[in-house]
Amino acid sequence: MTETIRERVGWEYYYYGNLPYRRGDPGWYTFDNRPRFNNNYVGLRNRMAILSEAYSYATFEERIMATLYFVEEILNHAADQRTAIEQVIATAEAIPLAGMDLGVRFQPSMNQESVEILMGDVETLRNPYSGSSYYERKDTVYTQTMPEWGAFEPTETARAPAHYVVSASAASVVGAYLDTHGVIYSSISEADERELEAFTIDSTTVSSREFQQIFERTLFGSSSSKWVAVEEGSLIVSTSQPLGRLVFYLLEPRSDDGLVNWAQLDKWLEPGKDYPIY
């Protein structure tokens, strides 16, 4: 696609990235791994999504045209590769997750080879009406070689279970989110006792800054096998379904973007007690 657009209009395209000019090692960094960002979420649903962003210092017209060319080539490529795309999706949906170690927390990973990034210069000007300063792009382009952090690697994993058991007390809250995401689950009609893996909470931290009207939470603790009294009305959520990876990300206690992180299970999270999902 990059070559096609270059031949068509003479413009250069590359993977989304930023230069951390205030902190971090110099390099080309992609954006956040968490599924709160739409295309990451779509990927968790075993579908494909493309982030499209135009260069910040391009003119409005250039940004519109750059986006148009990019979207056109994406659609052309998807149409040409539709059979391969369908096969990839079908394979992803058929993978059994039970017993797999999947990531719950991540960090950027550096690519093995450095990349050449086209850079430009700007000059600082002052707005004659407001007096505030702003940047204006200069007509200069040069290439800078730098490392690229274009993907992520897990810093912590958890083993995916065959299914989760959601305590009856938390069933209405968790069930509402599962319904929103289109996850399949069932309800236990008769109480019994089962040997399950329980996550026992030893501590919890809460972000000091509010984000979207919540304070993000992190749980700490340990897992062990124990006999649990499973009440009528508890939920069974299998990972053997097309949305199994999404189920895992939502319900794991240490997930960096699940229900715990979004403070939706706070009333059940006390040190010394079990996380209400087994």
PLM segments and residue spans:
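Structured catalytic-domain cores with a bias toward divalent-metal coordination
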Residues: 1-278
